[in-house]
Curated annotation (Swiss-Prot):
UniProt protein name: UPF0473 protein SERP1179
Sequence similarity: Belongs to the UPF0473 family.
Pfam families from the UniProt entry: DUF1292
Entry-linked InterPro entries: UPF0473
Length: 102
């Protein structure tokens, strides 16, 4: 993953990358990383994913899947875990809406 200066303010990386994850049935699902950012208030790195090839719905919306990226000891990659709090959900929604509108 991307190195960040974690003492700085909000850091955003919108370089796309493909990731393979597994669904609840153990099937491989390909996701595109749409956004990656570190938020200093929560002191966590987040990624926002969209299923590769996903079609927009009637309102031109594609489902986005936000996750927390917990880096491993070397700082490379790590594991993706679910969002933990309503405050994080609200913050992620604000960041995504800001990035989409720019």
């Amino acid at each position: 993953m991307t190195e960040h200066n974690h003492d700085a303010e909000l850091t955003i990386n919108n370089e796309e990358e493909l990731l393979t994850l597994y669904d609840e049935n153990g099937n491989e699902v390909l996701y595109r990383k749409m956004l990656e950012f570190y938020h200093p208030e929560f002191k966590k790195e987040y990624v926002v994913l969209a299923e590769e090839g996903a079609q927009s719905d009637d309102e031109d919306m594609i489902e986005l899947v936000p996750m927390i990226n917990e880096p491993d000891e070397s700082g490379d990659g790590g594991k993706l875990v679910p969002i933990e709090t309503d405050e994080e959900w609200d913050m992620i929604e604000e960041v995504v809406n800001t990035e989409i509108n720019e």
